[in-house]
Amino acid sequence: MKEEKYMKKTAAVLAAAAALTMSVYASPQTEFTKGQWEINAGMWNTKAKTRTYKDNSAWNFNGGVTYGLTDKAAAQFQYYGLNSDDTDGRSHELNLLYSVHPQVAVYTGYNHITMSDFPIGVFGAEKRENDIAQLGIIARQPINEVLDLYAKGALGSKNTSIWEAGVNFALDENIDLNAGYRYLNTEGSRNKNVSYQGWLAGVSYRFGGGSDGKAVYSENDIDYSALENKGHKKEESMV
């Protein structure tokens, strides 16, 4: 009887570990594989707002590509449209990411933000461009075998801050669906910032990097709590 319980417990933990192995590569990535590519694309329903001006939202394309330089670092290009109902804009990011934990990555990079078609009285000009140096962090928390919560945040020059949080659903080990809310705030003039915010959703696809997909962390580095509890419940129902 004891051997049977031990085998059930071992099977539950192994199943959890296998599921998390798939989960750690979920988008947005906090762990990388050398030579692996990730392509992501989606839509962002964003609106523009300043202290004295507010515009209705419009749907924008967002997308990017990430490439694993090593098993700990990656290079990334990311694009976000910043069009609202009456204004135009876009954001181009170039980032270097580094995994400090299977569920946490930090990054630094350059962000070029263009804002145009604002009424002249808002910024004193119709068009504004910001060149931004930024530092950020990405964190994820597995909920079960296929569902993660994620959060991203960055601070940069020109009084810039970027925040995003949402959920990620893994269709398989290479394809994810995600949805969340994104907020971008940056300098429009010396005494007036502009913010872009709204709901977004997208899909990501990973390929390349070999077939082993081995992580460079030990099992002790990974938070198994959400998956272990599920395994224990299954064990109790079987006894």
Where are the regions a protein language model picked out?
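Residue-level signature of outer-membrane beta-barrel architecture
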Residues: Y67, Y98, A139-Q141, L155, ...
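Repeated loop/turn-to-beta-strand initiation elements of outer-membrane beta-barrel proteins
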Residues: W37-I39, D71-F77, P102-T108, I143-L149, ...
